[in-house]
Amino acid sequence: MGAKKNFVIDTNVILHDYNCLKNFQENDIYLPIVVLEELDKFKKGNEQINFNAREFLRELDLDTDDNLFNKGASLGEGLGSLFVIAGSVDAPDVFDSFPERIPDHKILAVVDWLTRQKKDMKTILVTKDVNLRMKARSIGLLCEDYINDKVINVDIFEKSNEVFEGIDPALIDRIYSSREGLDISEFDFKDIIHPNECFILKSDRNSVLARYNPFTHSICRVNKTKNYGIEPRNAEQSFAFEVLTDPNIKLVALTGKAGTGKTLLALAAALSQMNDYKQILLARPIVALSNKDIGFLPGDAKEKVAPYMQPLFDNLNVIKRQFASNSTEVKRLEDMQKSEQLVIEALAFIRGRSLSETYCIIDEAQNLTPHEIKTIITRAGEGTKMVFTGDIQQIDQPYLDSQSNGLVYMIDRMKDQNLFAHVNLLKGERSQLSELASNLM
């Protein structure tokens, strides 16, 4: 352990992780009173940040006493103390640089004041607000991002699928002829092979799409299969269908840029297994353009979120167009929607539900925090499969990035579990124009 430090916590850290106070080891934590005032504004509502605000304030009330405002309250064994700085503090350097008395500047004032009061200890502002960190550095204050749930190396989650060359062609022939596959011990892989990892095996005369099955410890052939009218256009999409349709894999992550077919593949795979589940649920978080509240939009709650759900309906329409308008397949889809066997809605509307015997697809999962994804997964009951899709480089939430979003966090934590599979889709299949824009712009 290094020298003890003082950390001043910004509101957005608490809204990101209401358990954050437990993650600063033996260091002391300071909360400017303005942080509690800001949390009070977030208490009402059904979004995850509203829950986080309520839960943090509830636990703060249960775990502390009057010492919180003077001597400080202990956070528990092995942890430091928590202090609330009430009232204004003397911080002329801050208000000379930033005269406007907004919450951010009041937080900076506490950091500056504490830095001067506790000269024998480092005082560090912890905030997920990039702009506030820039302001802090501009006046010589120490600051950092909240990194407890950050994934350091995200490049490994964006690589193309492995191609193993120099494989004995006889082994590949045997994979083609064997339904169960070959024991992994017959292969001399130099790299670590994760459970359910998909790859291409090549020799000088043949090749095969394959997957490591952790339940049988075997390398199995991946077939190119059509699912509810959708045929895979490349190896990556074949890999996706492989893990999306395996009943032993309960949790799947599909990543990739726009146009790679993530959501379409997941929905088609779900529909091909409709008889195995009571319901197919397709949802996505609502992230308003420029982070404006959707409350100003006309209509009731369902009507307000309808524009944000349209991309999901677009994927369903793509599948419908694979069949004649009067076909049995299209009629079945329409009946499923009417009976709510197929449901497409905003993620907020399913919060708190227990999901049993459900094929659940969460789109745009890169816009969720690690805690939000954990909350969703823990709702899974018996017979449920959960699929999360997203592009970890296209994040619309202001306090998330490619290292701290819930999707990449889940992949990092689950990558060695037998029930989990991750496929990264690189090749765009929407159109030549879409592929060009994704690569160059």
Locate predicted features:
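Hydrophobic anchor at the beta1->P-loop junction of P-loop NTPases
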Residues: L254-G256, A266
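Conserved coupling/interface region of RecA-like P-loop/ASCE motor cores
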Residues: K41-S74, Q310-L312, V408-M441
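Active-site-proximal, substrate-binding regions of enzyme catalytic domains
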Residues: A3-I124, V130-N227
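N-terminal pre-P-loop "Q-motif" helix
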Residues: G229-N248
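Pre-Walker A (Motif I) flank of P-loop NTPase domains
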Residues: P247-A253, E357
